[in-house]
Amino acid sequence: MSKVKKNDETLSEVLVDVNRVTKVVKGGRSFAFSAYVVVGDKAGRVGAGHGKAKEVNEARGKAKQAAKKRMMKVPLYQNRTIHHDVVGKSGAAKVILRRAKAGTGIIAGGSMRAIFDSLGVHDIVAKSIGSTNVYAMISATFDALNKLASPKSIAMRRDKKVNEISVKSADIQVNE
C-alpha cells in the first residue's frame, strides 16, 4: 500500500454510511453522528475513512480527511478490472473479488460498489460472505485490494521477466 497525495478537485467522494450514535452521561444522552466515506480518483487510487462529530457535515468532513490520509494505489488490468481473483477477510466478513470480461459491469453490493466506482473499476464480480456490516465489508474489500499484484511487480519480486511468470491456458498441457 503506497500513500498518495492528490488534489481535492480530482477526487470523487461517496458517503457510504451515516449513523446517529448516543453516549449516555449523568445529565442524559449526548448525540453525535458517525460517517463513513470512500474517496477515489477513478484511476486506480482509493481510500476509506471514518469520522464522528456533533453534526453530519462535520462528521463527513472528518471522514473525508481520514479517507484521503489512507489512500492507496491498486494495480488495474487495462484500467477496467483487477489482475487476478482474490479473497479478503475482516472479522466475520469475507469478500471474493473476481476479474471480469469487458462489458460485464460492476456486480457488487452496496459499499463494495462505492469502492469500485471510486477506484475506476468498470468490470468486476464481487461476492460478500458472512457479516454484512458496512465497516467489516469495506475493511475486507480493502484487505483483498491490498493483496492484488500486477504481473510486473511479481516478476520484479522474483527477479524474472513478465513473460516467464505469465502462463496462458493454451500453454498448459494435460496428461491423459
UniProtKB/Swiss-Prot annotation:
Keyword Ribonucleoprotein: yes
UniProt key word Protease: no
Family annotation (InterPro entries): Ribosomal_Su5_D2-typ_SF (IPR020568), Ribosomal_uS5 (IPR000851), Ribosomal_uS5_bac-type (IPR005712), Ribosomal_uS5_C (IPR005324), Ribosomal_uS5_N (IPR013810), Ribosomal_uS5_N_CS (IPR018192), Ribsml_uS5_D2-typ_fold_subgr (IPR014721)
Keywords carried by this UniProt record: Ribonucleoprotein, Ribosomal protein, RNA-binding, rRNA-binding
Highest rank taxon of the organism: Bacteria
Gene Ontology molecular-function annotations: rRNA binding; structural constituent of ribosome
BP-aspect Gene Ontology terms: translation
GO cellular component: small ribosomal subunit
Domain S5 DRBM as annotated: residue spans: 11-74
PANTHER family xrefs: MITOCHONDRIAL RIBOSOMAL PROTEIN S5
Family: Belongs to the universal ribosomal protein uS5 family.
Domain notes: The N-terminal domain interacts with the head of the 30S subunit; the C-terminal domain interacts with the body and contacts protein S4. The interaction surface between S4 and S5 is involved in control of translational fidelity.
Role this protein plays: With S4 and S12 plays an important role in translational accuracy. Located at the back of the 30S subunit body where it stabilizes the conformation of the head with respect to the body.
Oligomer and partners: Part of the 30S ribosomal subunit. Contacts proteins S4 and S8.
Listed NCBIfam families: rpsE_bact
Annotated protein name in UniProt: Small ribosomal subunit protein uS5
